Amino acid sequence: MSPTAPISRFPVPELKDLPEDIRARILAVQEKSGFVPNVFLTLAHRPDEFRAFFAYHDALMDKPSGLSKAEREMIVVATSNANQCQYCVIAHGAILRIRAKNALVADQVAVNYRKADITPRQKAMLDFAMKVSQQSYAVDDTDFAALHAHGFSDEDAWDIAGVAAFFGLSNRLANVTGMRPNPEFYAMGR
């Protein structure tokens, strides 16, 4: 990978040219993380879609839930692997390493969650997320029963499905735009 390769096949706007709310959000992320994740710059190409994307992202990923933030990131990483999304596997793999405080599990989930050192509850969660991601038309009562057997509520099932479905959108946008992972993600949480 050449460090000078473009981060997107679409135009990436200059910060100074962005609407104030988007510029403020990007600068806040930069302040917190020390860099600007390329997803922000890539999606800023379409400000209205940027706002809608991050509003839904935040509603799913930041709210109180029966799922921990690490578990939500597990869903992102496992389903992004199935969707062959390099950007999301690398970026959210980094976030998972930090949230789970376990680089080994994060890498295991990124490659094959079925062999990862995770709990049976988390495996059931990821089995459901993968079915939503790859075969949503086949989800039925037996899938909900498997979640219930591990202590998940119907609201938790909605959260699992929401994260898997949202990141299906994100994976497809990242793949189509040719979004490149920031080099900073590779070392985070290691």
Predicted segments with their positions:
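Hydrophobic alpha-helical segments
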Residues: 1-190
